[in-house]
C-alpha cells in the first residue's frame, strides 16, 4: 500500500465529509467570484493539512463537527494566504495552474483572498470553541509576520541558519503545528497532549520545507519548477547556507549577496547550485530532516496507541521526507 493510502485509511469517511464541506464553502452565486472560487477549488492538492487535523482528532478522541469546521477554517485560511502570496511574489502559477492574479488581475486576487479569509473566520466560529478561534486568529498574524520576516531577511546581508528556521517556524511549520494542535484541541486532549501535538506538527512542517528547498537544487523536469527558483526570488535556503558557512568561500559569498539584492544572473545561480552540491549542502539538509523526523517519531511512540493511526502518522512522516515533488 502506498503512503497516501495508508494515511487515509483510518479517516476515509471523515476526509470525504471534509472535502464536501470545504467545496461548499467555496461556492458563490456571483459570476466573477464564482469563477475565481471554481478555479481555486479545481487545484485541490493532496489534503495533507486536513488529513493531519483529522488523524490527530481521532487519535485523542473522535472527529466531530468542531473538528470539521476547524479543518475547513484552517484550510481556507491557508488558501487565502496562498492567493495573497501569489500577488506579493508576482507568481503566475500555483500547483501547475495559472494563479488567480495571473488569470484575472491583482485587484481581483486580493478581493478573492479577502473573501476566502472571511469565510475561514465564519467556519472557525461554527466550532464554538474560544480556544480554537483564538488560535486560528493568532495563526493568521504569525503567517503574516513570517512573510514580513522573509522579506526582511532577503534585504538583510546576514546569512544564517537561525534566520532560516525563524522564517520556517512562522510559515510552513506554523501551519502544520496548527493542524496538529487544532486536531488535538477539537478532541478535548489535555493541555500537555495539545502542546506535544503542536511540537509534532512543527517538526513535520520543518521537514516539509527543507524537502521543498532541496527540490530547488534539481532539474525542473524532476520537480516541475526551474532549478534555483528560490535564489531568483532572493531566497537562500538551508543547503546553500550550510555550504557557504562550512567553506567560507568569499567568491560564493559575494554571489550569495547578489542573490539577496536581486542582482544575480542565471549563470551565477547555476554556479551557486553546483557549489552547494559539491560542498555537502544537500547531504547536510537531508541529515537535518532526519533529525526532525526522529523528534517527531518520539511523539508517535509516546502518544499514539491505536495501531492504524500510528501507521498512518508514520506514513505521513515518511511521505513528507521521501516525497518526489
What kind of region is each of these model predictions?
Residues 1-325:
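All-alpha prenyltransferase/terpene-synthase fold signal
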Amino acid at each position: 500500500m502506498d503512503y497516501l493510502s495508508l494515511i487515509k485509511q483510518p479517516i476515509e469517511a471523515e476526509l470525504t465529509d471534509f472535502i464536501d464541506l470545504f467545496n461548499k464553502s467555496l461556492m458563490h452565486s456571483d459570476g466573477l467570484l464564482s469563477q475565481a472560487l471554481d478555479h481555486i477549488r479545481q487545484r485541490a492538492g493532496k489534503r495533507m493539512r486536513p488529513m493531519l487535523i483529522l488523524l490527530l482528532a481521532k487519535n485523542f478522541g473522535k472527529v466531530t463537527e468542531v473538528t470539521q469546521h476547524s479543518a475547513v477554517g484552517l484550510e481556507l485560511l491557508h488558501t487565502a494566504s496562498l492567493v495573497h502570496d501569489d500577488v506579493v511574489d508576482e507568481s503566475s502559477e500555483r500547483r501547475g495552474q495559472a494563479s488567480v492574479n495571473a488569470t484575472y488581475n491583482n485587484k481581483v486576487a486580493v478581493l478573492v483572498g479577502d473573501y476566502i479569509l472571511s469565510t475561514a473566520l465564519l467556519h472557525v466560529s461554527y466550532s464554538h470553541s474560544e480556544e480554537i478561534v483564538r488560535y486560528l486568529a493568532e495563526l493568521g498574524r504569525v503567517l503574516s509576520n513570517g512573510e514580513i520576516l522573509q522579506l526582511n531577511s532577503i534585504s538583510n546581508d546576514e546569512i544564517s541558519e537561525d534566520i532560516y528556521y525563524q522564517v520556517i517556524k512562522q510559515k510552513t511549520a506554523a501551519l502544520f503545528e496548527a493542524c496538529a494542535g487544532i486536531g488535538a484541541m477539537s478532541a478535548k486532549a489535555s493541555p500537555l497532549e495539545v502542546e506535544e501535538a503542536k511540537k509534532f506538527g512543527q517538526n513535520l512542517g520543518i521537514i516539509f520545507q527543507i524537502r521543498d528547498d532541496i527540490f530547488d537544487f534539481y532539474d525542473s523536469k524532476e520537480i516541475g519548477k526551474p532549478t534555483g527558483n528560490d535564489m531568483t526570488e532572493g531566497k537562500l535556503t538551508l543547503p546553500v547556507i550550510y555550504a557557504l558557512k562550512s567553506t567560507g568561500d568569499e567568491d560564493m559569498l559575494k554571489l550569495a549577496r547578489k542573490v539577496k539584492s536581486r542582482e544575480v544572473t542565471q549563470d551565477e545561480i547555476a554556479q551557486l547550485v553546483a557549489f552547494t552540491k559539491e560542498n555537502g549542502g544537500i547531504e547536510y539538509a537531508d541529515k537535518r530532516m532526519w533529525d526532525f523526523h526522529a523528534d517527531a517519531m518520539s511523539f508517535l511512540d509516546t502518544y499514539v496507541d491505536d495501531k492504524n493511526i500510528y501507521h498512518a502518522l508514520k506514513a505521513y512522516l515518511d511521505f513528507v521526507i521521501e516525497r518526489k515533488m
